């Protein structure tokens, strides 16, 4: 039964990831209505990335090609997004949602919650799918022609997006930021979504910079750029452990409005990234364990699967 379930998962990805530039969306091929839930688009604050986690490890690397086409389109629209929404003239970025036309701008109808609409990290996270493809296949031509240019463009934006921490100028943080679809409560009872220096943002940037450096090294190019990325990487604000022994999600040790919310984006460093481990960072690994204990286990999908 377990093998059947495993192969069923592979089948779902195979059947819905065959068209260049059109990866598996939120509903796959079998939507029950003309207007699919969440418009049948691509949520890139976890869903699209998670769809492709099994592609390489279950020997389906060719299924990543549709993601390549989508990201290439997003890099084009994402430059406009970076310039006109964020005032940054270098690189590209994307919000938390895209579609078959590679939309990259912040989403919503003008009165949506910033907990998911005010997020600029989608592109930086999604290009890790491309890096994973290179990491598994070691296809140097793919790295040179596809993955690295898109990763570098995402880095260009993030280098401009980072600011010095006003409380510790030696460190770099993002501002503004959110932790996707989550809200906090301050010590004074204020409820909000946007702040600065969120854990998820910095985990994504940490992974992006680290892997882009590796890509440049593999290609033997951009040595000065590698130095710049490494310098910024070393200045990123580190992980912090909260008063409950949990991994802090926010810059300050604030409570979540919903401790059992399904999104646990601040655990990205644990998985799918490997910045936190029992072997290398036991204190942070224990804090991640405590976070999961607090959050509970009430589903089998993101983020509590």
List PLM regions with ranges:
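Gly/Pro-rich turn-and-neighbor structural signature
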Residues: 2-18, 23-27, 65, 220-234, ...
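Extended, hydrophobic/aromatic-rich amphipathic alpha-helical segments that build helical scaffolds
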Residues: 2-16, 123-131, 148-149, 153-158
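Short, glycine/acidic-rich hinge or "gate" loops at secondary-structure transitions
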Residues: 20-29, 143-146, 163-174, 221-228
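Acidic/histidine-rich catalytic neighborhood
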Residues: 153-215
């Amino acid at each position: 039964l377990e093998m059947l379930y495993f192969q069923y998962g592979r089948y779902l990805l195979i059947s819905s990831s065959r068209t260049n530039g059109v990866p598996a969306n939120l509903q796959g091929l079998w939507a029950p209505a003309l207007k699919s839930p969440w418009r049948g688009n691509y949520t890139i604050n976890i869903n699209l990335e998670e769809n492709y986690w099994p592609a390489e490890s279950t020997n389906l690397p060719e299924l990543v090609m549709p993601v390549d086409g989508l990201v290439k389109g997003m890099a084009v629209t994402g430059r406009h997004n970076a310039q006109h929404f964020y005032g940054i003239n270098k690189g590209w970025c994307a919000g938390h949602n895209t579609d078959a036309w590679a939309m990259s701008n912040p989403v919503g109808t003008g009165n949506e919650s910033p907990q998911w609409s005010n997020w600029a990290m989608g592109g930086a996270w999604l290009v890790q799918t491309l890096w994973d493809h290179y990491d598994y296949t070691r296809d140097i031509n793919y790295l040179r022609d596809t993955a690295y240019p898109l990763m570098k463009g995402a880095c260009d934006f993030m280098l401009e997006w980072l600011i010095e921490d006003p409380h510790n100028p030696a460190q770099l943080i993002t501002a503004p930021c959110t932790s996707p679809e989550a809200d906090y409560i301050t010590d004074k009872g204020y409820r909000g979504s946007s702040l600065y220096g969120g854990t998820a943002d910095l985990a994504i940037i940490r992974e992006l910079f680290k892997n882009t450096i590796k890509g440049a090294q593999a290609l033997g190019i951009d040595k000065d750029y590698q130095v710049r990325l490494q310098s910024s990487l070393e200045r990123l604000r580190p992980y912090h452990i909260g008063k409950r022994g949990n991994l802090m999600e926010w810059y300050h040790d604030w409570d979540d409005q919903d401790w059992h919310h399904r999104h646990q984006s601040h655990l990205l460093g644990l998985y799918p990234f490997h910045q936190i481990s029992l072997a290398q960072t036991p204190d942070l690994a224990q804090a991640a364990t405590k976070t999961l204990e607090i959050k509970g286990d009430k589903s089998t999908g993101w983020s509590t699967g």
